[in-house]
Amino acid sequence: MKMNLKPAYRYQFKNFLKGSAVFYIIMAFIITAFMVLSVNIGENSSINFGGYGLSVAIYMFVVGIVYIRSDLRLCLQFGISRRTAFLSELLSLLSISVILSIAGELVTASAQAVASGKPNVFVFDFYQLIYLGTDRVSPTFGQHIMSAFTNTSLFCSVCIVGMFFSLLFWRLNKFWTIVVAISIPFALNGIPYLLVKLGVNLNPLVKWIASSPFCFILTCFVIAALVAIIDWCLLRNANIKAAK
């Protein structure tokens, strides 16, 4: 099979872009409605909005689950190798993450400009909430750039993790699919409890990640790289079959 990276990337990018455009329009409408609502708010009341980054992260996680299977099947039908399909998928999700991050900064900055004259109206995003605080109404241009990098790393990592769950369930039979699906909530609650019982203190790691956006970005890309390797291991020998 040929290394047809360009056509595979073009198709997958367009596929990502269509859904992302609809999602962004919805988010822009929500933020616009929020700003319209804030116009008539009294001085004794306060209102805040800071959900763009986390909303996109959830969206990208779902995208990672949904798109990888159909994209792989279509690429193989057109004679494109699994390696090329996987690489083009990674490039597509990186491109969309960058676009959604920049677009998010634009709409957030616009909303912050409108709310600048109202001290009781707060518009902020993930980066500002962690590293600047909500009391700073208008981040600088450099801080918006850093926020875009932070969001890009977050969006990429959660999308690749979503791909992992999709590929994992793709490889499992029905019995193990049910077992793993039931085990996930128990693992999410049980592993932290087990770590505490074993005396493993994660607070230094959490503080290190929260100490600087560079630490956060590095952590996200390390997670993305490690999970991407696991994704490829699941994908390279998978039997191509319909989604469950």
Model-identified regions with their sequence ranges:
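Long, hydrophobic alpha-helical segments
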Residues: F49-S70
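Central hydrophobic cores of alpha-helical transmembrane segments
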Residues: K174-L188
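Transmembrane alpha-helical segments in integral membrane proteins
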Residues: Y67-R69, T150-W176, I223-A238
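Hydrophobic residues within alpha-helical transmembrane segments
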Residues: L90-L91, S95, L218, V222
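Secretory targeting signals
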Residues: A33-V56, S92-L172
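Alpha-helical transmembrane segments of polytopic membrane proteins
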Residues: S20-F23, G53-I58, S147-F155, S183, ...
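Hydrophobic alpha-helical transmembrane segments
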Residues: M1-S45, I191-K244
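Helix-loop-helix units of permease transmembrane domains in multi-pass membrane transporters
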Residues: Y9, I68-L94
